[in-house]
Every structure is written in structure tokens, then in C-alpha cells.
């Protein structure tokens, strides 16, 4: 679907060993700090100073008390009010904290508010300005828009591929599962498929969700089952050897959205010579450029000011700085 043969090959330089990292899940760069959802030493987040990478802090205690989390799954930055939103998948809540004087702290002084969600949104929840976004299956729609009280006020988005079994909702979600990412001003967002290659761009304007652009060419390769219980149709899905892992994550900057793409089937996962791709789009969905990496990256964070891509390799969880060809200097440890 994209001209990967024309993508530039980029290489990385290790800046921190795996001894410093637990199991990194997701990364954000805010005020020259690299935040990593990374359960380690009783904390949920590892924070690395990108000016001095030897300066590492652990924040966000594990627990159910004030300013604690059980299972962080997403961190969203809002550039309009200079705040961070933390989504706890186990507690089903989003907690907001303000950034004061360029200091990122999770305590009573920086706490702003928190919002709890019910089982109507069983998967990912992302802060979106005064609203929230959720993925899943909502009356055959892919996404839901929620207000500040966590009430669903709109359901939208139709999966462009095979919708057989969509009425089963949670079971069907494996076939059309997506990851979500907003822009820094939280007026636009992108969704990308985990096992299919849907990539769809939306903007929020005049209290309406508007689709800007959509790419799609491949359904999820799953084993689908159809049985009957009396007059009721029952559908289920599961992975097989042909199931292909497509987009792994999205990362937003002020001007662009980056997509990390694998395109590797389960049967090929143990083979050597695997590569991945980083695609760079503007917020209207136009592909600006792409990069090829001769390794598998688990997740990425982009610093466009210093022209660096920070990444964690798979499966060694080694932290790297990946150079783009136009970079003139490395980030030194």
C-alpha cells in the first residue's frame, strides 16, 4: 500500500543498556523528558532526561491509593493546557496531572481530576480535549466519543473490511482491533489496525467527528467460527499462523503522526532478517516520508527538534537512539 522499497534505511546507536529498563510499553517525550510506561522497581513510569541520559527517575507508584496506578496503558499530552492524562486499564480510569515549571510530578499538588469508566468501553480510552475516545465495537461502529462524565455521546467509524460477526462486538474486536493516537492539541486523531492495515485520520470540528482520510487493503487473517445456539448466531475469532501483525503503535508530534509497521505473519516471527518500517504522515493523512529499520522495534518516540527517533528493540528491550540521515550529531549517554 506504501512504497516501502523507496524508504530510507536508518541505523541506531545504543544509549542505555537493558539493565536500566524493565519492560517498556509506551513512550512520550515532554519537556526534554522521555516518559516510558515501564513497570520496574515498584514504579509504573521510567523518566529519562534526554539532555543528560544518566539522569533517570522512577515515578508513579503501583497501588490503588491517591496518585497510584495498577496498570498504566497510555499517556497522553495536551499542549493546550500543558497536562498529562494517564489511562489505567485495570482501574478503568483516566487521571489528569498538570505540568508545573517544566516539572513532571505525580502528587496532590499537580493532580487535576480523574474520570472512571464502565464496561461499555472495554479496551483503550484516550483523552481528547474535553472528551474521550474509545475503540471497540459500539453497535457495529469502531469508535465512541465520550463526554467529561464518561457518557457515550457518539458512535462512529465503520470497519472498511469484512464485517462478518460485527454484531458479536467483543469477539469481533480481535478482527478490527486498532490503536489510537491524538495530536498534541487534541483536535485530531488517528487509528491504526493491529492485525489489519486500516489507517484512518479524523478531525474534531464544530462538535463533529469528520473523517479526513483512510487507507486499507488487508483484512485480519483470523480463524472465524460460526455456530448456532437455537436461533442465535455465535461468532468467535482467534489467531493462526497466517495472522499478520501490522501497525504496532502511533506517535504524534506537533506537525506529524508516525506509524510503526511490522507486517510480519505469526509463522515468520521466529525467522531472522526481520525488518520494520516507520511511516511519517501529516495530519491530513499524506505520507511525507518513510524509514526502514533492519531490526524489530517495540515502540518509538520522536524528537523532531533534534531529529532523533528513540526506540526499544525487540526482543532485547535495548534502548536506542535511531539516526535519520539528516542528523548531524548523536545523542550521547
Each language-model region and where it sits:
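Structural signature of eukaryotic scaffold interfaces centered on beta-propeller domains
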Residues: 25-28, 74-80, 123-128, 172-186, ...
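Blade-loop segments of beta-propeller domains
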Residues: 54-85, 89, 111-115, 294-298
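Beta-strand-rich domains and repeat architectures in extracellular enzymes and scaffolds
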Residues: 13-43, 248-265
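A short helix->beta-strand "capping" segment at the edge of beta-propeller domains
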Residues: 1-22, 233-239, 286
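Asp-box/WD-like beta-propeller blade repeats and closely related beta-sheet repeat scaffolds
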Residues: 99-129, 135
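Flexible internal linker/loop segments at domain or repeat junctions
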Residues: 209-250
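Loop/turn-rich, solvent-exposed surfaces of beta-rich toroidal or solenoidal domains
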Residues: 240-280
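Conserved blade-ending motifs and adjacent loop-strand segments that build the rim/top face
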Residues: 218-229, 283-303
